[in-house]
């Protein structure tokens, strides 16, 4: 049994919890805090000295020691963190609201990796007194739940940071057709700047957050592209929208000051409003009046430069230079890709992390936030991007990935190479490594079998065996994945479906146009019922995965999507049966020529593409209509 000296009672209690994840042999470890290296471990023959600079770094040191002792008796390790703060932000606004138990599990793993901060992105998924439509049927956290999560983070000397929205990205709230909500709206998902009831709402946001001990908050304000162009324009006429942003920011910062908060905000809108073509990554000319405002505000807010796409250090460096025109107080947010369907993309996350880390170090950035977004339904599992999180931890503490696999196996029980096989549904054989967002995992699954509008973006002769092999690989890994086995079981079933579905629309059309009624009958009576059975099983596995990680709210969207898919397969069966029986003389859906879904990669020599909006994948008809 391992023996520690120099621990506080709280640290001893936390280490007991972490023994559920890692194991240490019978050794003696003398622990002390030091102002030298972030982590230092020395010793041999069962006697070790461990020092840490910041309290949260003790738990990474524990993991690093466990890894070293599994390989040998003599240990001499020193690590120096490049970043004062390393955070993970979980998206709890795209239907998947991390449940409290899973938040605690995530905190434990992050502690072992060396993270200082745990963040939850909550657009409307926290409760505000006097705002019943805010988070209505969305699984909004109560103040007590947030306090419980924060207390658990503090147990491991981690900071909890809420990430909210105080301008845009509030579509789930402002959609409600009641006066008390609509009077707050400018256009689309954007609040009406200058409306006093808007600032009452924002005061209520901070009143809820003030029940926490943390006094650090991200106030959002990103992607408000149409700010000032809806009701604001009708009420006030044309104004300089960069100045309008500054005016709103000042009001929000005043409210934050009232409650004692220091704010961060996503930085993109300043650049989009001041660049010639409205893009984030362009040179900007700052109008003088806006410059005066920014100079007054810049010491009150940290700008977060977010970028999840660049594959070269210089692209990041250029954007850092642009940011420094506005402020020197800059944090960086990179991405752990879990927002392109059911399947993560840890491979691309690794590629961009390597380049972003170089630029962050070169620009003396002191805070890095790794974001786990969940666009269009939060369908990717919360824990599927653990490799991406370990990658950023290694880059922070070591500036290399030489010990990535060893440290990851200590923390999860599985090699990082095996864990990253979760990506397989996105890793088609002919795809370049440096392209983001290509997501066959999603569009092959959701597209219709009679109206397969993405068929031009599939290459069945290579895709079908790829998915079949992926299903086998993932099933094998599941057997050794321990507490993470459910991730591999779900992905294995998904890949089995993709293998059967990727050529189905094409084969139906070929048989129909060839007059091959025997093949049509075989598909209608055997293959389609089998596919429905596979999808029903996947829905069951996915539901278990969702409920293990998240609150139940938001699962209804997946029920609707998969239920619709199943009904469309039934419709295909009946349409084909009617044709085969002579009840109809043609199948109109099969008479339509298939066109490219988009031309994003039209100049490339592969077929796959990006399609991440369910309502455009599932049908060419209109779902959102008046």
Predicted ranges, named:
Residues 7-10, 37-39, 98, 141:
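Alpha-helical hairpin
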Residues 45-264, 331-334, 339, 346:
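Feature activates predominantly on carbohydrate-active enzymes
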Residues 1, 76-82, 293-295:
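Short boundary motifs at domain starts and secondary-structure transition points
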Residues 5-6, 31-33, 43, 52, ...:
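Pocket-edge structural micro-motifs
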């Amino acid at each position: 049994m391992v023996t520690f000296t120099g621990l506080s009672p709280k640290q001893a209690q936390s280490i007991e919890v972490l023994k559920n994840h890692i194991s240490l042999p019978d050794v003696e470890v003398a622990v002390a805090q030091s102002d030298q290296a972030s982590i230092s471990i020395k010793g041999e023959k069962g006697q070790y000295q461990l020092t840490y600079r910041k309290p949260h770094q003790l738990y990474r040191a524990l993991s690093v020691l466990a890894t070293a002792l599994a390989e040998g008796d003599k240990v001499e390790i020193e690590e120096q963190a490049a970043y004062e703060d390393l955070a993970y932000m979980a998206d709890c606004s795209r239907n998947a609201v991390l449940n409290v138990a899973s938040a605690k599990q995530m905190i434990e793993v992050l502690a072992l990796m060396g993270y200082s901060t745990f963040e939850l992105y909550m657009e409307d998924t926290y409760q505000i007194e006097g705002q019943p439509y805010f988070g209505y049927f969305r699984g909004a956290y109560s103040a007590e739940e947030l306090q419980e999560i924060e207390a658990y983070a503090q147990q491991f000397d981690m900071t909890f940071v809420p990430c909210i929205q105080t301008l845009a990205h509030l579509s789930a709230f402002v959609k409600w057709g009641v006066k008390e909500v609509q009077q707050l709206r400018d256009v689309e998902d954007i609040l009406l700047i200058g409306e006093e009831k808007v600032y009452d709402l924002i005061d209520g946001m901070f009143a809820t957050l003030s029940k926490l001990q943390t006094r650090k908050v991200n106030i959002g304000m990103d992607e408000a592209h149409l700010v000032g162009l809806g009701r604001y324009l009708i009420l006030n006429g044309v104004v300089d929208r960069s100045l309008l942003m500054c005016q709103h920011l000042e009001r929000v910062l005043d409210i934050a000051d009232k409650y004692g908060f220091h704010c961060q905000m996503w930085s993109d809108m300043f650049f989009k409003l001041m660049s010639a073509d409205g893009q984030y990554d362009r040179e900007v000319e700052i109008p003088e009046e806006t410059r005066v405002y920014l100079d007054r505000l810049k010491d009150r807010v940290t700008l977060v430069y977010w970028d999840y796409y660049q594959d070269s250090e210089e692209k990041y460096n250029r954007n850092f230079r642009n940011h420094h025109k506005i402020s020197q107080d800059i944090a960086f947010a990179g991405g752990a890709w879990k927002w392109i369907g059911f399947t993560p993309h840890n491979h691309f996350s690794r590629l961009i992390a390597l380049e972003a880390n170089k630029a962050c170090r070169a620009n003396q950035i002191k805070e890095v936030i790794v974001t786990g977004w969940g666009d269009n339904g939060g369908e990717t599992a919360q824990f599927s991007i653990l490799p991406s999180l370990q990658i950023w931890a290694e880059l922070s503490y070591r500036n290399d990935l030489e010990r990535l696999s060893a440290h990851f196996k200590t923390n999860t029980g599985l090699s990082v190479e095996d864990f990253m096989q979760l990506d397989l549904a996105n890793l088609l054989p002919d795809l370049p490594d440096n392209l983001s967002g290509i997501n066959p995992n999603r569009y092959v699954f959701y597209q219709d079998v009679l109206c397969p509008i993405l068929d031009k973006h599939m290459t069945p002769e290579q895709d079908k065996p790829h998915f079949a092999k992926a299903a086998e690989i993932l099933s094998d890994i599941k057997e050794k994945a321990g507490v993470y086995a459910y991730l591999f079981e779900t992905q294995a079933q998904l890949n089995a479906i993709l293998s059967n579905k990727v050529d189905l629309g094409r084969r139906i059309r070929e048989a129909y146009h060839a007059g091959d009624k025997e093949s049509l009958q075989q598909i209608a009576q055997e293959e389609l019922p089998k596919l429905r059975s596979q999808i029903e099983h996947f829905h069951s596995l996915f539901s278990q995965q969702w409920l293990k990680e998240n609150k139940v709210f938001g699962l209804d969207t997946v029920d609707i999507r998969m239920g619709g898919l199943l009904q469309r397969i039934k419709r295909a069966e009946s349409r084909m049966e009617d044709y085969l029986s002579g009840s109809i003389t043609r199948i109109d859906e099969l008479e339509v020529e298939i066109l490219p879904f988009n031309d994003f990669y039209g100049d490339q020599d592969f077929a796959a593409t990006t399609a991440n909006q369910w309502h455009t994948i599932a049908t060419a008809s209109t779902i959102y209509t008046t």
